[in-house]
Every structure is written in structure tokens, then in C-alpha cells.
Amino acid sequence: MGQNSSERPIPTTDYKLLAGEELLRVDSFPPRHFEHSPSTIEQIKRLTNSPDTTTIGEHGPSVASLAFDVSSQTSVNPEVSPLNDQVENLSLTPDHLRLYEVLFGRDSLRVAIDLISSYPELARTTVLELAKLQGVTYNSEREEEPGRIVHEARDKDDAIAKDLTERLGWGWPYYGSVDATPEFIRTLTAYVRRTEENHAFLSQKYIDKSNTERDIAYALDMAVDWITERLSANAEGVLEFHSELEKGIENQVWKDSWDAYHHKDGTLANHTAGIASIEVQVTTYDALLDAADLYRHVLDDAHKSDSLIETAEHLKSVILAKFWTDKDGGYFVLGTDRDDNNTLRQLQIKTSNMGHTLNSRLLESNDPAIQRKRDAVVAHIASDKLLNVSGIRTLATDEVRFRAGAYHCGSVWLWDTHHIAKGLRRHGLDELADNIDRKLLHVVDTTKIFPEYVRGDDADTPSINTDRVVLWDSVNQRENIVEQPPQEVQAWTVASILAIKKRLDRRQRAIDRRKKEIL
């Protein structure tokens, strides 16, 4: 049990148990209560270590999460405990709310890309800092590879780093993700394309991990080469993950909990071979096209541009053929694994991941077959099996492993939902996208935090987990934490909410301008 938790008697009926599962313990974490809705601006300043809004991005990328600074909050709930006791409790920051106060590659890049219109400097410094940490050699403990973008950058003397090294054998910084590298390319190219600095950024110098002076164009080359090598490592040409470290992250994508990747019957994906996630393929497809455009029009390398376009088009054909099923009205499956004969198998479960195909060039086509796929995905996203009061569930309610409070198997992640809403708007589905955005704003107004995720239940009001629920899974011979409290200030949640508010402000200003023109 962590700080500020208490173990309570094990209930017999409160939690869903699958075959072979046994409830081991339930640790309670009374939530901290805040009187006012939090400020997006204040929290993004804290996350980026910026003294004011004009310096957001100047002091480096965002950390992944923080706990609220209770000294700046009115945080009293007399019904929970006597006033004096509660103030004393709130003066402490529980350990379970301080898990990710460091740089994570994918998180920082998602924050940067969501806020690039308002804070382009944040995208610049995020790309630059990650370029400095980009892999330069092969190291199994760190899962480092040349060109690979870091997953988690901790000092080796950090208390959490020491624990992970002792228990899991990780080295630092740790590179166990496959989505950070295509996200890096997408953010880099977006910054070059959309800012005044433009292609001059490609000449920006930095010192890499080998203490060698490089420029951003070199970091782009290395990231692109890492992706193309990964794609060529299998016959199908998909970007797979497979940890070579005995206790490395098993699912090296944003849904990185160990049970997130599974088959229709609940059987876990085969981790002895490569696994490919649908949203990673989609992000990689877009990253290849973005890079190709830069090579052709800025770096004057038409040959490399043509090669990347050819690779992207092949990947697109594989996505449409291998990651689509006509079952249940048709949808993009979570991903693929491999059987004992190394044959690709679909992970045929309905997840929020399918929605990521909407926020991509993948489905931008007049081809009736592709339009039917797009419409089928939208129908699933809008169904009550995925959509609830808070947003889009990570896993549909009719799937075997669905649990409303599970980390990636039923909960609602606000950044994930926001990303999908942007995709809906991209295809002209503004009304549905606006409805989903309102759900996200309602979550923050209700919980008074920027939660990492919220419950995916059928309640009328958004809520967060207050227990850590631990099961024993006899089938897979391991413990499974099926519920845990979320972080209070998750960076990509803050970025999503801030992006929504900025968009609404722009819309209102446009309306006001039109009114003035009429008058």
C-alpha cells in the first residue's frame, strides 16, 4: 500500500472476475476534494516550468503529470473528515499521485502537437530536447536503438528509476516505446511547416548522447531510418513492438498495461513475437508522408521522398487489408499478433484505437470502400458501447475484458477522446465532435482535476477511481491491478482541454467579427 492509502475488507461481488481470477486486496485512496474548477493555463505553466504564458516552451517540454499544488487550492470537504485533519492531509502529496513527474516521449509530443497553434515554442523545445536524447547505439537494458525516441527519461538516481531498475532491470533513459518516434517526426514536420522559423529549424545545432554535434535534419534522418528499418523487419511491412528485455514494457504503445492487447475471448496477445497496433500504423503512415514532403520541398531529396511515399502507400494497403474486419458492422481491430508459425492474426476487439484512423489522411478518400469504413468507425465511436457521459471508452462494454475502471480496458482517457473528436471534425462531423468536447469539459468541471482518465461506466456523472484493486490471474500467473486512482494533473489532459477552449475562443471571436460586419 502507498502513502495515504488504507486496506479495507475484500468485497465479494463489487468487481468483475474472469475465469481464473481471484481478488487479492483493495487499497482505498480517499480523493482530494477541490472547490473550484482548475485553470488550464496555470497547470500548463506548471507542467512546462514556465513563470508566465509568454515563456511556455522556453524552459523545455512538458513533464507527463503532476499533483495539484494544494497551497493554491481551496480544498475542503467537511463531510470527508474534520476540517483540521483534512487540511493536514492535503498538505501532503500522496506517492500514488507523483508517478510521472518526468519527461515521457509520447506524452510531451502529444502535448506539443495539441498546443502548437498557441504555443509553437513548446513544439520546438520538445523536439530539440528529444533529439538530444535520441538513441545512438544498441543497448538491451535501455532498449535503445539508433534513431529511436526515448520513452521515459529519468535520472538513474531517481527513486522510481532505482525501483524499476531493481525490479525490472531497466536502464536509463528507457526507450521502450514504438509510437514516440513517428510522433517525433509528426511534431518536427508540423513545427517546420507552421511556424515563422520554418525550415531554418532543420539547421539548429545540438549535442547528442554520444557528445557529437548534430542538427535537427540529422535527427529527422535517424528517426525516419529507424521506422523504415522496423517496417522492413517483417514480410508484411508493419511497425511491430516486441521487448527484448525480459521485464521490459510488454505493450510498447500508449495502452501499455499488460492486458490491453488481447483476443476476442480474452486470451492475451502473443508477446513472444511482434505485435502491431492500429494507431501506430496510422501515425507512422502520416509521419512517412510528412517526412516525404519535407525531403522533397525543403531538403531537395526527391529520391528519398519518393521512397517514403512508396513505403507509406504500402503501409496504407496493409492497414486496410490486415487491420479491418467486417464483423460487428465492420471496424479496425486493435492490432495484430502472430501465431506459432509467425502468421499474422487480428486482435478482434472494439477499442477507441479505431477512432485514431479518423484523425489521419488514411481515410481521406472518395473511394466508396474507404468511405464505408469511415462511416462504420464513426458508428462504433458514437455507439453506447464506446461513448459514455465522459467520452470514448478505451474498450467496448461488450468485450470480455471490459471493466469500467480498468486502466486501458474500459476507462475513458481524455486525450484519446479529444484526438478522436479532432478526427470527427476533420471529416465534417462537427456536431458529434462538439458534443464529445462538451463531455470532456464536463469531466474537468465535475472532478475539479485534470484526470489521467475517468471511469467508463454508465453513470450519469463522470467519476474517478478511488481504490487500487489487485487480482491474481492464475491463467497468466501474475497479479493484475484492474483499478487504480488516476493522476490529478495529466499533461495531455490539460493540453486537450486547453486546445478545446482555444478553439471555442477562436469560434466566438469569428462570430463576433461577423456580427460587427453585419452592423
Question: In which residue ranges do the predicted regions lie?
Answer:
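PEST-like, low-complexity acidic/proline-rich intrinsically disordered segments
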Residues: 2-5
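Extended glycan-interaction surfaces of carbohydrate-active proteins
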Residues: 11-103, 131-169, 232-275, 314-412, ...
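Extended, well-ordered alpha-helical scaffold segments
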Residues: 40, 47, 119-133, 198-230, ...
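Aromatic-rich carbohydrate-recognition surfaces in CAZymes
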Residues: 101-245, 278-281, 347, 411-427, ...
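Exposed loop/turn and edge beta-strand positions of beta-sandwich/beta-sheet ligand-binding modules
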Residues: 278, 288, 353
